[in-house]
């Protein structure tokens, strides 16, 4: 699997190539957390967001379907005692309805065959009134990193810019979405909406 193969060098690529946007994005997402929040993070990758979210919340469940990525998350978060790290599929979550106050799914929507199914699952497991936070790289198609990742088998399903990212949520009937762009070589647009 592509993501397990690159797990060992993923942070290096991300920090060298896109460190500015990644720092801004992880800091912004972490700022949305509250100390009493129970948070689900899907597609946690190497724990880039996990390590910033966990210290701010009551508990964090970080999931990914790549065991290689989960090993990196475990190592990065080893000093945090309020995090549960486990294998999981964003399109088929094992959690009960209304189990979390917030859910984060960073940089994964563009990889999914059925992103609507994933968002429906996030909506199912987040309590009414809770937040769903979906950061996604924009203008990624033109980037050196996208070309490199695709060459080695990443298989991106879609590419976003500021406009079609907003259209993406509109077509799913999700309203009142706020957007926050974090600039960098691969800028990231953080979409946030309240679960209704």
Predicted regions, residues:
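A short glycine-rich, Lys/Arg-flanked "PGG" loop and its adjoining helix->strand segment in the class I
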Residues: 116-128
